[in-house]
Amino acid sequence: MTDRKSFLAKLDVGEIFHAEAPNGASLICLVVSVDEANLRARRITSQDDLVFNRQSGMTADGDIIDSVAPLPGEIHKVLLELDRKYQIYDPNKEPERFRLTEEEKKALRFVKPHYSSNPLPPLP
């Protein structure tokens, strides 16, 4: 069985993964940069920046990467478009642009069962 460090080491810029916050919140994250020690990611739905330890997959706040399973191409594309949409539009000025499309809803519904059925090995 491959250990979690091996899976985490393979993550690269542009990939999407799932993490969980200590309160159980789902964090759909896009890798924005990597170095030997850290993996920097942005939450797609909130645009929060997170820094994960590359060895453990944890943030200083206790968020933990729990799945790095690749998404089907179309789902990945829709989530990248959603990330871009949330980057360029201001919800206070253009709230109508933040309404989810049917494709975006479908992609977000797909994520939970997909990542839940493809977990990383637990921390040792």
Predicted regions, residues:
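Short beta-strand-centered aromatic/proline hotspots
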Residues: 26-34
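Mixed-charge, Lys/Arg-rich low-complexity intrinsically disordered regions
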Residues: 1-12
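Glycine-centered tight beta-turn/hairpin loop motif at sheet-sheet or coil-to-beta transitions
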Residues: 22-24, 47
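Short, solvent-exposed secondary-structure boundary/capping segments
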Residues: 37-45
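Intrinsically disordered, low-complexity, charged/polar segments
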Residues: 47-124
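Tryptophan-anchored aromatic micro-motifs
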Residues: 12-21
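Small side chains
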Residues: 19, 30, 41, 57, ...
